[in-house]
Amino acid sequence: MAKALSLTIFLFLLIASNVQSARLLDEVQTQPQLVPQVPEEEDDSPQAVTTTPTPIPLPGPATGGPEPILEFFMHDVLGGSHPSARVVTGIVAQTEVNGIPFSKSSNNIFPVDNAVPLVNANSINNLINPNTAPLLTGLSGSQANTVIQNSNGNSQGSLSSNNLPFVTTGQLPPIAALQQLMFGSITVVDDELTEGHELGSAIIGRAQGFYLASSLDGTSQTLSLTVLLHEDHDHHDTLDDAISFFGVHRTASHASHIAVVGGTGRFEHAKGYAVVETLHNQEDQHVTDGHDTILHFSVYLTYYKA
């Protein structure tokens, strides 16, 4: 009896455990699906950055930029006993001079047909004298009374010395304006350069070149100059520190801008520009019997050999 009861209880418990196991097996818990994470690809292509260029103002007095790298004063002396400027082409008053070289043949000089005579010491007084030399006004753009000379046709003492003669206004054609006579005249210069404009200022070099009257109204001079800065050494024995300029100097304006086109020495391959100002009412600053025009150069360089 006891064994039958024990067997019954054992079977009951066995069946109950099987039922519980089957129920647990049927209840499958839903597992979350694992999705592999793919790393984001980095964009290696460079990003285009748009920047607006900022304009760089040119240095100079108008923009309040840096100070000029160099300043000097050029003295252009016309006439007198020691001129630094001489005319080489231009209009003269007498038509005989306009005919040089002559179109007529002369057997007195060349014993051949159609020869062209040369000017000699005997004929020079009849051709060129202080009253037939070209008219100049210089870099100041205005004619000075001290420049015009008249020695009544006498060339002695003028052509043989450093005096530079000029025509008088009475010899000019009545219908020709002064500006029209100036137009096209070329003047070569070998002017002194000083540190300041005042009397006795130290000489730092020379300006050599020429200027051309390039406007019909007489207010423009085309400059082509090379400034030689020898300062404390002999510029004939050493390489000069030189700057070359080219541009138009407008005598009617307060200041003009001309280009720096090159240089030598420490200014080799120089680039930039110069502001040129004409100093007025400076006639009594220097001892000279000619007309001294003073130009103030302020040089601004964007590149030069230090």
UniProtKB/Swiss-Prot annotation:
Its main location: secreted. Residues 1-21 form the signal peptide. The keyword Secreted applies. GO terms for cellular component: apoplast. GO terms for biological process: phenylpropanoid biosynthetic process. InterPro entries: Allene_oxi_cyc_Dirigent, Dirigent. It is found in: Secreted, Extracellular space, Apoplast. Keywords: Apoplast, Secreted, Signal. Pfam families: Dirigent. Coiled coil: none annotated. It comes from the Eukaryota. The keyword Signal applies. Residues 36-61 are annotated as: Disordered. Homodimer. Belongs to the plant dirigent protein family. Dirigent proteins impart stereoselectivity on the phenoxy radical-coupling reaction, yielding optically active lignans from two molecules of coniferyl alcohol in the biosynthesis of lignans, flavonolignans, and alkaloids and thus plays a central role in plant secondary metabolism. This is Dirigent protein 24. It comes from Arabidopsis thaliana (Mouse-ear cress).
